[in-house]
Amino acid sequence: QGTPVVDVCIYYGTGIEKRIQYKQDSALMDLGYQYDYVNSDVILNQMSVQDGKICLPNGISYELLVLPEESGISIEVLEKIREMVYDGATIVGPRPICSIGLYKSTEIDRQIKSITNLLWGELDTPLIDRTVGNGKIVYGKNIDQILSEKKIEPDLKIENRDSNFSLDFIHRRNKEYDIYYLANLREEAIDYATLSFRTSGKVPYIWNPVDGTVIEQRVYVDDGERTHIPCSFDPYGSYFIIS
């Protein structure tokens, strides 16, 4: 239940046809940020921008749209990106240089160059951070750095820990609750870790998905911005934290 809380959407480009997993997503989960993949249809027909966030009709909103490391793009998608940037979106990725699709032509390539010069600038540099309209075009920075500059903290931080590990997590939100699902994907137990969540002002509860028991988490720290909870996990163990 609830709406997924996701900070980053990654545009698949032509990668969906080639079954490519892009390098941008490889560290996002470990850094504490969730991401989605989107295709051209979602960009063209569902995305809008409100208060600097990229929004979908189902209530999901993103801080960033990340473009693939590809030289080609459809003119329709590029025109929509231009519209979203002027409306306030932050777009992360390299400058496209040519067209793809049924209408690939020299004239379309000229249109693409005109739009990319407007958005990315006329100089092709390894680091780009340009304000265009109400939005930004960024390239050459790590995604977590860009989010940090936007004052977007990781949704989940693993602070004190007894070993080097990572957790899979899903965060959903409804009108009353923030719901985190946490899973240890290792065959070793996690004896101790302090997890820091991007929520505050609520009492956390732990729900065991195996037996359905719910207990109030009495030991936690709410610093006014984040909630810090000591946790442990059985091998392949999981549970929900609801606040």
Segments predicted by a language model, with ranges:
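Carbohydrate-binding surfaces of carbohydrate-active enzymes
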Residues: Q1-S243
